[in-house]
Amino acid sequence: MSWDLLLVRLPAEVTSVSQMAHDYQPAPLGPRHDVLATVAGVLPGADLSDPAWGVLSGPTWSVELSIGAADPVDSMMLHIRGAGDEVLTPVFELAGALGCKVFDCSAGDLITPGGTSGWHGFQRFRDRVTGEGR
């Protein structure tokens, strides 16, 4: 079970998906080669041996980077497992380097650096469903 975040290009003034036109089509993140180079530069510890599916491991968490095989890369899905708020640091570093905003698929809206409520809510839900923390 993972907390899923989508990195997507949105206009700077958009702070909530409710501000977006229904038919809005985001710009791609860029050519696949450039996106992979950005990931490698921002997250040097990421394993990109499978360039469509990278993995970044932290002390108490992991992030799977679903980059896909398309060229150009339209968006990137991050699948986060584990615990610890420090996982948000590489998420927002990568989002910034790619010129993206971070969409919390569980909450259905954008999150900002320091916005941990979605992550904490996911961990509570996960622990309740899996019986952990009892």
Locate predicted features:
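Acidic (Asp/Glu-rich) sequence patches and key acidic residues
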Residues: 1-134
